[in-house]
Amino acid sequence: MNRIIFCTFLQKKSEGQDYPPYPGKLGEKIYNQISKIAWKEWKLQQTKLINEEKLNMFNQNDRKKIEKYMKLFLFNNE
């Protein structure tokens, strides 16, 4: 059975994630507030950012940067 949540990104009810897609408290927040559709949009944006800014996901500073972008993208109204 699909989980229906109110997606804060889309501002409407939508199918929720099957599991937290990110570790920790942020992952739980995403699980509870971000739909599969919104997460897919973020993944596309993330790929663009990684490529355009030549980010290296093995580099801790670059991972922190992409996390910051993710928070802004998904929760920019908070």
UniProtKB/Swiss-Prot annotation:
InterPro entries, alphabetized: Fe_traffick_prot_YggX (IPR007457), Fe_traffick_prot_YggX_sf (IPR036766)
Keywords, ordered alphabetically: Iron
MF (Gene Ontology): iron ion binding
Protein origin, superkingdom: Bacteria
BP-aspect Gene Ontology terms: cellular response to oxidative stress
A GO term from the CC aspect: cytosol
Record SUPFAM superfamilies: YggX-like
Quaternary data: Monomer.
Functional summary from the UniProt entry: Could be a mediator in iron transactions between iron acquisition and iron-requiring processes, such as synthesis and/or repair of Fe-S clusters in biosynthetic enzymes.
Family in the record: Belongs to the Fe(2+)-trafficking protein family.
Full protein name: Probable Fe(2+)-trafficking protein
Provenance organism: Buchnera aphidicola subsp. Schizaphis graminum (strain Sg)
